[in-house]
């Protein structure tokens, strides 16, 4: 327990040292706009309110969920030598649920983002109406399989 106490003491001293260095060497240039409240009549130099694109937020949430799913699979990969058949079934079931969720999101159109590049007459976003559309995606051209 003594080493843990020394570690906590060392980390606390380093944190206080960085705080003191910041207080001593940081520039302090106060002016009226910096000290006033934003809600009480702050006159900004430019527009501070920007429109928020909700499909991008939905993709960000999907990305965070994907990261959590990958972190959930890390212990399985780390213990490949001692895994049993049951653990293989569990991880395959988990991957099936993740894949089914991805196909569902793709089918609902949650992964499409309309950008200025595809706002012309030709829409290039990917939206599936049913599972039969997956075969018509042509994700890999036939010429890729020729030698």
Swiss-Prot record:
Under what name is this protein listed? Answer: NADH-ubiquinone oxidoreductase chain 3
- The scientific name of the source species is Neurospora crassa (strain ATCC 24698 / 74-OR23-1A / CBS 708.71 / DSM 1257 / FGSC 987)
Q: Could you say which enzyme class this protein belongs to? A: translocase
Q: What is its EC number?
A: 7.1.1.2
Cellular component aspect of the GO annotation: mitochondrial membrane; respiratory chain complex I
Could you tell me what reaction this enzyme catalyses?
a ubiquinone + NADH + 5 H(+)(in) = a ubiquinol + NAD(+) + 4 H(+)(out)
Record has NAD as a keyword: yes
**Localized where?**
Mitochondrion membrane
User: What UniProt keywords are attached to this protein's entry?
Assistant: Electron transport, Membrane, Mitochondrion, NAD, Respiratory chain, Translocase, Transmembrane, Transmembrane helix, Transport, Ubiquinone
Gene coding for it? ndh-3
Q: Does the keyword Phosphoprotein apply?
A: no
Q: InterPro entries, alphabetically?
A: NADH_UbQ/plastoQ_OxRdtase_su3, NDAH_ubi_oxred_su3_sf
Function of the protein: Core subunit of the mitochondrial membrane respiratory chain NADH dehydrogenase (Complex I) that is believed to belong to the minimal assembly required for catalysis. Complex I functions in the transfer of electrons from NADH to the respiratory chain. The immediate electron acceptor for the enzyme is believed to be ubiquinone.
Family the entry assigns? Belongs to the complex I subunit 3 family.
**Domain of life, source organism:** Eukaryota
Any one GO molecular-function label of the UniProt entry: NADH dehydrogenase (ubiquinone) activity
Name the residues that span the membrane.
Answer: 6-26, 60-80, 84-104
């Amino acid at each position: 327990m003594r080493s843990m106490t020394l570690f906590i003491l060392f980390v606390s001293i380093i944190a206080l040292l960085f705080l003191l260095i910041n207080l001593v060497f940081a520039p302090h240039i106060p002016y009226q706009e910096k000290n006033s409240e934003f809600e009480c009549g702050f006159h900004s130099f430019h527009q501070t309110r920007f429109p928020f694109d909700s499909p991008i937020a939905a993709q960000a949430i999907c990305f965070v969920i994907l990261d959590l799913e990958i972190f959930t699979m890390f212990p399985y990969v780390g213990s490949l030598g001692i895994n049993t058949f049951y653990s293989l079934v569990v991880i395959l079931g988990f991957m099936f649920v993740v894949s089914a969720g991805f196909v569902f999101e793709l089918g609902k159109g949650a992964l499409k983002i309309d950008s200025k590049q595809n706002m012309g007459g030709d829409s290039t976003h990917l939206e599936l109406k049913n599972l039969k559309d997956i075969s018509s995606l042509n994700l890999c051209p036939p010429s890729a399989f020729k030698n």
